[in-house]
Amino acid sequence: NRLTNDESVSARDALNFYFTPYQDLGETGDKICLCASLAGEFMALPIDMQKEVALFFNDHLAWLEEILVKGQKLGEFNFTEKPKDLAHLFVDALQGALIVQRATQNFSQLDRIIRTLTVKLKS
């Protein structure tokens, strides 16, 4: 990814950039991630669409893992978990927060999840 390979972009800035679409979606109660919506009906999707949805999530996981590895190497992040495991936690928590926020109309849910995740990087 260009952001993780660009030495002028900090890992924290890349992570904040990653959060932006989630925050944009979370500002209203009527939007969620399209792939999260499709994943909810994954088995009913045609095989080609299943592959694309899986690719979307796998690309996001790989990108987050790159950001976390970069941040750890540069001393921006301090965590003991495997970067791959944290990437899964981030994607799962962000996607879940969008869905729960939509159902509960609690629009602080996503911001609370993002704060909790970023605090995790300082442990």
Briefly describe each language-model feature range.
Residues R2-K31, P83-F90:
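Hydrophobic alpha-helical connector segments
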Residues D13-A14, T28-D48:
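Amphipathic alpha-helical segments used for helix-helix packing
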Residues D48-D59, Q72-T118:
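Hydrophobic/aromatic-rich alpha-helical bundle segments in the mid-to-C-terminal region
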Residues V119-S123:
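Generic C-terminal helix-cap and adjacent flexible tail
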